[in-house]
């Protein structure tokens, strides 16, 4: 008659049937011939078949991804030892009391059943911010401030959009308004990168340019690890400014392309093949800085007297 009737405690837990057809259309429990029909207090009732929220699926998918061809276990112990835990969980603030909470609960339940190795599924958790409309408000069709990324890609290219998003600000925890002037600036920068080969010189490269490249590699590598993509992009821009002024060697040019590749994958692929390379730039080793080249020849030390800066000493 449509009444909701709770299952008596003595009948808990309600176990699911094992002879379900998982390949049927719709909900397998709905298609089962007998399971959903039962009695409570001698009254015939129909069990609820919509039993699992979609958050249940997203609470353990990573355990299956690492061993998705295993037909004996949902996730083997060896696969979990090789891959788990998830290094970093990125999500919005709304996940804190929703998906994050559910997936941690699910992991602890699986741990209690002896099916997983760790009590916690994630090593670290970071909030990511929102891209706001040009007016500084959350994008909304009703406000007319929605930026369509597909339209932007068609207008200025995927690399420009990707690199502009990286340049907007620190990735973690902040919101940033879309700025058409900002994305135009990134587009101009990539056009300069496209023409950087014109500044490759046959002569010996200027020492300061070589030093700056190795410093840039250090900075970009460190910033990527700390999710500070905006300052990594800034360092790349500073290097291009220097290279355009002094010229750069072919080796430095190739190192720079490999360094830029994660930020502008399509442009760097084209530039890489233009050098006569037979393999993708994305199959190459990431550039490594030489500390002896990157090291400063002079160090400035502040001199303090009674806690106040009184001067500086420069040592070579």
Residue ranges, per PLM feature:
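Structured secondary-structure scaffolds
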Residues: 1-201, 212-241, 251-260
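Acidic, turn-prone loop/beta-hairpin segments
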Residues: 2-9, 13, 132-133, 203-219, ...
